[in-house]
A protein has these predicted regions:
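Glycine/tryptophan-enriched, flexible segments
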Residues: 192, 200-203, 211
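Active-site core of glycosidic bond-cleaving carbohydrate-active enzymes
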Residues: 183-194
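Acidic/polar-rich alpha-helix caps and helix-coil junctions
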Residues: 1-175, 179-184, 205, 209-477
């Protein structure tokens, strides 16, 4: 017998159940059914066949339900950040959302969507009772490494870092090299993502050049307003994307208008510059100076309240007859982002959407709200979107920016001074920009065009595991 109290022992066991569920779900969403090990094995019992996917999901869900009945609503002191009942319920909702999605639910069984809806609604309601909710600002969970941000009411489950024993590289890795040290330039946005963001009023991206109320889509190669694709966008754009000429907002900028130029020949050497023409600024703490950029400990958020809301909205849209609930959630997300309500108070959303339009609206909002949080790839897999005709032969696109003939003789320093003269921000946001720069669109990776069929949505088991366990069968496909 040990010295732990029964209460402490049960809470440790509940956390272990959560972690086992989390790891099993990571396997199941990749491979489908996997060997389900629920007790200590001896060597003779180590070869176990794959279990059915349905059995694995059932075990994961049951374990999370059990954990949620034991875990507290929060932890204090040095235990702050441990797994809570809200985290268990939120993960349960995510698991059932995946299981209801097309990758696992080829016949679109409505009962699975109802179960996913019920689980996510229960998670939302419990989280609200426990004090969770949206932060007042979009970047409130990562704007700095204070407990006020990292343990804010929106954070449900995260990987915690603590300098100097356990440092995080995200703040260093996302920045351009001239603002960081070592390997940088992570999370470089593709043109497709950049063009996807809605406008500041939540409407579809584009510009009404003729004033007739009809928008023309942005065209990065145009030299009129259609080419100013960074102007007037969703506020989340500017907390995620950095385009040529924007100020990268850091405390140790040498001067107020120190801009990030990404044109060819104007940046750091090409081997270390952006491969897409863009940088990301999400997860950046502006007050961290270049010399300290790797001495940092920003937590990595895995589940936040906004995702739970979007999980619920997607399930509500699929279940049907819950349109007001879907609209309420989408408006709440957009209002917090800073999008204007407009006269109809729909924050740019189309009125009276069909069921499919609502589903598409939720998936779109997930793409924008959760950008660079590790969700989009899995959304596309579980929805089997890689097989959609629009992605057949798809290859990622980038922009290449060059100086115009009138400015091509300017050095980077002279260009920066010339651009700043008279107001760099006004030049950046007007057609005066095209006196300095011209843009072309190119493919990033023609060698890797998408061609995914319905048998490619579960990964093959690694050969070494098949060799180590004769009872394992390879994934079909």
């Amino acid at each position: 017998t040990g010295t732990l109290s029964e209460d402490v022992r049960k809470k440790i066991e509940a956390q272990a159940l959560f972690l086992r569920s989390y790891r099993y779900f990571e396997l199941v969403k990749r491979y489908g059914g996997v060997p389900l090990i629920l007790s200590v094995q001896d060597r003779k019992e180590s070869e176990v066949p794959r279990e059915k996917t349905s059995v694995c999901i059932s075990q994961i869900v049951n374990d999370l339900s059990t954990a949620a009945t034991v875990l507290p609503k929060s932890w204090s002191g040095s235990d702050a950040g441990r797994i809570t009942r809200g985290a268990a319920l939120a993960l349960k909702g995510r698991v059932l959302l995946f299981y209801a999605s097309k990758q696992f639910n080829r016949n679109n069984d409505a009962a699975r969507w109802q179960a996913a809806y019920d689980a996510n609604l229960a998670a939302k309601e419990q989280l609200e009772k426990d004090g969770y909710g949206l932060n007042s600002t979009y970047d409130g969970t990562w704007k700095d490494n204070s407990d006020a941000s990292e343990l804010s009411k929106e954070v449900i489950f995260s990987k915690r870092y603590s300098y100097p024993a356990n440092k995080s590289d995200i703040n260093a890795g996302v920045r351009p090299l001239d603002y960081s040290q070592g390997a940088t330039g992570w999370n470089q946005p593709t043109l497709d993502l950049v063009l996807a963001y809605p406008m500041a009023d939540g409407t579809v991206p584009g510009v009404d050049i003729d004033g007739d109320g009809v928008k023309e889509p942005f065209d990065p190669t145009a030299t009129d307003e259609r080419g100013l694709f960074w102007v007037g966008r969703d506020p989340r754009f500017y907390k995620t994307i950095v385009t040529n000429g924007m100020v990268y907002p850091l405390a140790d900028n040498q001067y107020p208008e120190q801009r990030q130029f990404t044109y060819k020949g104007g940046e750091i050497e090409i081997a270390n510059s952006t491969k897409t023409g863009f940088y990301s600024c999400k997860f950046i703490n502006p007050v961290v100076k270049k010399v300290d950029v790797r001495n940092y400990d920003l937590d990595l958020v895995e589940i936040r309240y906004a995702e739970v809301l979007l999980n619920l909205a997607e399930c509500a849209a699929e279940v049907g007859n819950k349109d007001p609930e879907v609209y309420t959630i989408l408006k709440e997300i957009r209002k917090r982002a800073g999008i204007t309500a407009n006269a109809d108070e729909l924050y740019g959303l189309k009125a009276n959407m069909t069921k499919q339009e609502l589903i598409d609206a939720v998936l779109f909002e997930r793409r924008i709200e959760l950008a660079y949080e590790g969700k989009r790839f899995w959304d596309m897999r579980r929805r089997m979107m890689f097989s959609d005709p629009e992605y057949k032969g798809y290859a990622r696109e980038r922009i290449e920016i060059e100086l115009t003939d009138a400015k091509k003789e300017l050095s980077l320093n002279d260009l920066a001074k010339d651009f700043a003269n008279g107001g760099g921000e006004s030049k950046l946001n007007s057609v005066d920009y095209f006196k300095y720069f011209k843009t072309i669109v190119t493919k990033i990776d023609n060698k890797f065009q998408w061609d995914v069929d319905d048998n490619h949505y579960f990964f093959a088991l690694p050969k070494k595991h098949l060799e180590q366990n004769a009872k394992l069968e390879q994934t079909k496909g």
